[in-house]
A protein has these predicted regions:
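A well-structured
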Residues: 1-278
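Short pre-active-site segment immediately N-terminal to the catalytic Zn-binding motif
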Residues: 340-355
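Short beta-alpha connecting loops at secondary-structure transitions
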Residues: 340-344, 371-380
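Auxiliary, metal-adjacent structural segments of Zn-dependent hydrolase domains
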Residues: 258, 276-336, 348-349
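Catalytic Zn2+-binding segment of zinc metalloproteases
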Residues: 360-373
Length: 385
């Protein structure tokens, strides 16, 4: 099914919560593993369906943040998601306490329980209001970024559309583009500062309500960190300072030499890799996707089938357009067992990187599309290393 044909309707939140509650009661009352397993699969299906609706609303909202319908839907999901998280937390708690835990482990592995224990540490009904407010603030941030209309050389550009000028080999033009972007950020500085300040205090409150020193520990739990700790990250940071910073310093010094610039360089000069200009795609968006199709077909039968399915079902929105949210991402549409790629092509090397980076995420999700539990589709320990 093509993305544009996928139906969306706001779910009845109270009815969905009741469905989760009924499944929870049946799960707790199960007398055998077979009974518990059957309810488990029902809960998986419901969870996947609700998540699909949420993702459809989110994707369509980010494609055009000016769309009034999906703007209202995001307001709904910002309030609904924490309440649904409460349902999920109750389910995870029941799974952890289940007399059939060993049976589930034998069939699906122990990772689902490791993750459930972490998720349990990241939630409490006491922070429902803060979670809803957090969603609202992050949505406001996305809309603010998407609203950028930056005048430059007689045109008006979004942040993404301005990027080619910020990489221009002409020093004066490149610097002017950076200044134009900086002027827009400065103009909206109070709004950005307000959102940041509110989020910092909000998340600090959430962490303290859960009994932590602040947000850091809660942040680790929310990210599902199941294979390394804060201490490990501190060691990694020390290694970055010791090994990577000197290497990066030498690379930037070489770059300054190529450009004939004094080191350290300013932000505008940092953006230019070669005096002749940065690498750029040889074609437009259609040409890039055509080459991506050729690449994935030659890579393996599986990647070929995957990428052609993405193209046929219009599961990529890559053009940079007014009102579109910034950046790029990949997500899953569970009911359809397919991923979706969101990007902002702007004529820079970033366009080609998206076809490998986000498509890499998408292929991983595609290969995991029928995994149980549904949370295994996106293993946070492996999505970004």
């Amino acid at each position: 099914m093509k993305f544009s044909e996928m139906p969306y309707a706001r779910p009845d939140l109270d009815a969905v919560k009741q469905q989760f509650a009924d499944l929870l009661a049946r799960f707790k009352a199960a007398a055998t593993y077979a009974e518990a397993h059957a309810v488990f699969l029902e809960e998986e299906k419901l969870n996947k369906h609700v998540d699909t609706l949420a993702q459809l609303a989110s994707v369509r909202n980010t494609i055009d943040t000016r769309d009034k319908f999906y703007d209202e839907e995001m307001n709904f999901w910002n309030e609904a998601t924490p309440q649904l998280q409460e349902c999920q937390n109750a389910w995870s708690r029941a799974m952890l306490d289940s007399p059939f835990r060993a049976d589930f482990t034998a069939e699906y592995g122990d990772l689902m329980f490791v993750n459930a224990e972490i998720a349990d540490k990241a939630f409490s009904p006491d922070i429902l209001d803060e979670m809803a407010q957090e969603n609202k603030l992050t949505t406001e941030y996305g809309k603010l970024i998407a609203s950028a209309q930056i005048p430059f050389e007689g045109g008006v550009y979004t942040l993404s559309q301005l990027s080619p000028f910020k990489n221009d080999p002409d020093d004066a033009r490149r610097l002017a583009a950076w200044k134009a972007e900086g002027a827009w950020y400065k103009e909206h500085g109070a709004e950005f500062d307000g959102l940041y300040d509110q989020l910092v205090h909000l998340r600090d409150t959430m962490g303290k309500k859960l009994g932590y020193e602040g947000y850091t520990t809660l942040g680790y739990y929310r990210m599902g960190r199941n294979c390394y700790t804060k201490a490990d990250v501190e060691k990694f940071r020390a290694a970055v300072v010791k090994y990577i910073v000197p290497l990066a310093d030498s690379i930037y010094r070489e770059q300054a030499g190529r450009l004939g610039k004094q080191y350290p360089m300013n932000a505008a000069d940092n953006a230019l890799m070669f005096r002749s200009g940065n690498p750029r795609p040889a074609g437009d968006a259609d040409a890039i996707l055509k080459q991506g199709k050729k690449f994935y077909e030659e890579l393996s039968p599986e990647t070929g089938v995957f990428f052609n399915k993405m193209l046929d079902d219009q599961l990529m929105d890559v053009l940079s357009t007014p009102g579109k949210a910034g950046g790029g991402y990949c997500t899953s549409l569970g009911d359809y067992e397919m991923p979706f790629i969101f990007a902002n092509f702007n004529g820079t090397q970033h366009d080609v990187e998206v076809v490998t980076h986000e498509a890499g995420h998408a292929f991983a999700a595609y290969m995991n599309r029928d995994r149980i539990p549904y949370s295994y589709v996106w293993p946070l320990s492996l999505i970004h290393i």
